Amino acid sequence: LMESGVLTCRGFHCEVITDRTTPPQAPVRFHNLFFHVPTGNPGVTPTFPPGRSEFDEFRWWRPIDLISSWEANEIRLPPPIVTLARDLVEAIENEGDLQSACDALAANPPTGKHRFEYGPGVECVLIPTDTLPPATHTNCFILGERGGERVIVDPAAKDEEGFEELAFKIQEIYDDDSSIIATIFTHRHPDHIGDLQRISEIYQAPIWASSETLEAMTHSDSDRVLKEGDSFILDGPSGGISWDIIESPGHCPGQICLVGESGIVSADNCTLVGTILVPSGEGDMGAYISGLERIRDLRPKVLFPGHGPLIANPKRVLTEYIEHRKARHQKVLEAVKAGNSDISSIASAAYSDSPGAHPLLAQDQALSHLKELQRTGDVENDDSIYTEA
């Protein structure tokens, strides 16, 4: 309307200082523009707009103070705001003041790959993998501070695009004068373990993983078995960052999570994209549900999942997962009590509220529930015929 002359505006100045496109972790991506709008009135106070539940607080911040509070885990910021604030801090150092910094960014916006900083000392690289749709990537996390010790978690690269993404990040790490002290694999599923031979041509580091995961790959004497209660500290410019190991084997035997002050690297326990399967062959539904409850009880600030965007509201998401799995567990039991005895009819009854569920996946998940019901003595199995105990 303003371009057509229908509307006019005087005394208003606005400039785009950068833009960001959300990474390909979800079916829908967003292109965001960030503006600088000088008000000319230092007394203007930001007000909290009603109905905006995604925001926690509105206030003015100096960019350097914003980053400092975020790095101290005092506040949470979405990844685009972190890199924007860092760009502003650098531009202010170069230009002398905020207005000049914004003018410089508007004239020459930052280009190229942006770091995905999910939390202090937690970066993410998206590796394309053949994982469960609608997810298309596995999250490879880089732990530790720039200029300090780093750990690579789940480098799942198996094709040229994945190798290029990983190689770019590794070079960036070395350019920061960082050292890579280990590669950690959260579990042994193929969408988390990449081509180790090709990866070793990009960088070399000992492998840390659970005994079950190490048994699934070729490893050396320099590798380390991680188990419940273990921990490690990554030294960096601001001190040491500690990470603790907890076991969460429901989705996969030997799966581990990494617990730190910034949040929990939660592997394949929950996701905002699609669902998490508990395979009937090797999974454990009881351990999976209790693992979700344990992670929730740790009250993490953020979850860094194996697939999809970071989870900024862990308590709500984990509670939804727990309630959903327990409700499905009850539906499977009720299906058996109603006289359904074979896996096909049990799955059809238990998943009657989910007509879009793939029948083979529904049967596999129903079987996982049945195995747990057998373990607890609620169901009996006689040559794949299930009856109430």
Predicted regions, residues:
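Active-site segment of metal-dependent pyrophosphate-handling enzymes
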Residues: 1-46
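Extended, hydrophobic interaction surfaces within ordered domains
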Residues: 27-41, 47-110
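Short, well-ordered beta-strand micro-motif
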Residues: 36-38, 60-62, 117, 126, ...
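Conserved beta-strand hairpin/beta-sheet module of binuclear metal-dependent hydrolase folds
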Residues: 122-172, 257-269
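Active-site HxH/HxHxD metal-binding segment of metal-dependent hydrolases
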Residues: 136, 157-242
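C-terminal regulatory/interaction regions
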Residues: 334-389
